[in-house]
Amino acid sequence: MKNDKKRMLLAGVLALSVLTGCSSASAASATSSMAASMAAASPAASSEVVSQPETAEGVVLPIAQGSLEEIKTGSYQFAANITSVDAKKRQMDMTVYAYDSYRTEDIDGLEAGEAIRIHPDGAVEAQDLTVESIERNEETDIVSINGGIEQGGVDLWRSNDVYRTVTYDDYPVYYMVGELVLPMDENITLSDSSSGVDAASVETNGTNSVASAVGADLDSWTEYNTTVSTTDGKVSNILRIWVP
């Protein structure tokens, strides 16, 4: 990553798409993480995720992700590419994405000779990368492993007390978790400020209105600008932001 790029604030990216949990009381918030809860109202088709061990000796692991099965019954927040919407069936087809993030203490203590588990270049399966060199830039809060992305390595940026992957365009390095068909909550809400960098958010409520708004612009709901929130396995909120 070029020095001038490293000095830029990493703005305009989605709020945490990592599938981590918290209380169901905050499930309606587009910027809060959510925890698993009760069963979904209807079954959802999915592709399976390869599970990974939560511990590995000598390897720094990313913060644990929720699985597709958990999303189908729980309350979560994640980046998604919405591919279709059916107002009559009150359901949406989408591809779920995540990115690797790490506890601050794990990255601060990482040294050459150790390893870090990561999804390189957005690969579906994670790999263990041996750390040959590590450079910490306190001014930019960026940690470059094996020369950073400019030299085929990895750059991690510290945000919200965690480190996450970052690309040249300041986005996280998204990888595909799998595909889901999820029902829409009858009180679903949509907040859309994607029309411009300073655009006011357009608020839409209810299954029919939200389905119509999403369906009218179906090719423009991607992992880079769209965050989906679920409550008890139903889509309860969609947030779309402007991206350059």
Where are these regions (language model features)?
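Bacterial lipoprotein signal-peptidase II cleavage site
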Residues: 9, 22-34, 38-43
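C-terminal motif of bacterial Sec signal peptides marking the signal peptidase cleavage site
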Residues: 17-21
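Solvent-exposed hydroxyl-ligand-binding patches built from regularly spaced Ser/Thr
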Residues: 49-244
